[in-house]
Amino acid sequence: MTDVKIKTISGRVYFVKTAEPFEKYVERMTSFNGYIYASTIIKKPTYIKTDTIESITLIEEHGK
């Protein structure tokens, strides 16, 4: 499992858990045009438009 932090151009911060390795996740998100599922800091589910992503940061990668 990979824990990822996403910051948008508006300054909001979101979190994603994915089964993909971090590098593959970043590659897919930067080449994808649409919405991704994420959670807010209080774990409220939401969707983020990929063209509003400012940064994608690895928090922790399990199971390497």
Give the positions of each predicted feature:
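N-terminal acidic leader/helix
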Residues: 1-31, 37
